[in-house]
Design a protein with these regions (language model features):
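ATP-dependent carboxylate activation and anion-phosphoryl transfer catalytic cores
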Residues: 75-77, 126-218
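Active-site nucleotide/adenylate-binding loops and adjacent lid/helix of ATP-dependent enzymes
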Residues: 19-148, 189-193
């Protein structure tokens, strides 16, 4: 069953059948220690990181640009996230979401194994979207393991952390499998686009919930 997002709401369509039940994310949610679920809650994580953030209903301290998204989103992929200018009140926003100061800078996805960095990739996308990425590239940027996660290393050997401008914004108890096989460049292909790969690239099917059907990889 394909889950898609339309006008801010999640709806299910029997359009295509994707295997969502056996994902690494499913396994994590079925087996995670309840005491560690705070890591999956982006509001709690952001508060622990001392960011300017709060739940919908709480006023922002200063007018500005904020990222507003669900506190918990197992499906990932930026579902429900939006960039908003907020003057003060947030009562009119979606219940269950939270707001956080807007960060600028490189968007990095980093895999750690027992606290040691194993992979770092940088994502690029147009400014007008939070979901449709243009590309992801492997690089050699070193990002220190977040100290806030030190006491979890023994229980979760693999962790994937996302950073914007050096700020930790998201944590997953799994690794990034898109770059398996020494892949260095991952270019998403969206519905309606050609699946004929550029010279030197291979096309692979990588369907997701935003209309991505695959990717050119090299």
């Amino acid at each position: 069953m394909l889950v898609t997002q339309t006008n801010g709401n999640i709806e299910q369509k029997m359009k295509k059948t994707y295997n969502l039940e056996d994902s690494a994310e499913d396994f994590v949610w079925k087996t995670i220690d309840p005491d560690d679920i705070w890591v999956m809650d982006k509001l709690i994580l952001s508060r622990k990181m001392k960011y300017n953030c709060g739940p919908v209903g709480q006023d922002v301290p200063v007018p500005g640009w904020y990222i507003v998204r669900p506190c918990v989103n197992m499906l990932g992929l930026g579902l429900g996230a939006e960039k908003l200018w907020i003057e003060e009140e947030t009562y009119n926003l979606t219940i269950g979401n939270f707001w956080c100061e807007w960060f600028e800078g490189k968007h990095l996805s980093v895999d750690y194994y027992k606290g040691k960095q194993m992979l770092c990739v940088e994502g690029h996308k147009p400014e007008h979207t939070l979901t449709k990425w243009k590309e992801w590239r492997r690089n050699d940027i070193h990002v220190p393991f977040p100290e806030i996660l030190n006491n979890l290393i023994q229980r979760y050997t693999w962790m994937n952390c996302e950073f914007i401008g050096g700020k930790l914004i998201e944590v997953h108890f799994r690794r990034n499998e898109d770059f398996d096989g020494n892949i260095n460049h991952f270019i998403p292909v969206w519905e309606g686009e050609s699946t004929t790969p550029p010279k030197g690239y291979t096309y692979r099917e990588y369907p997701d919930l935003h209309g991505r059907i695959g990717a050119f990889v090299k």
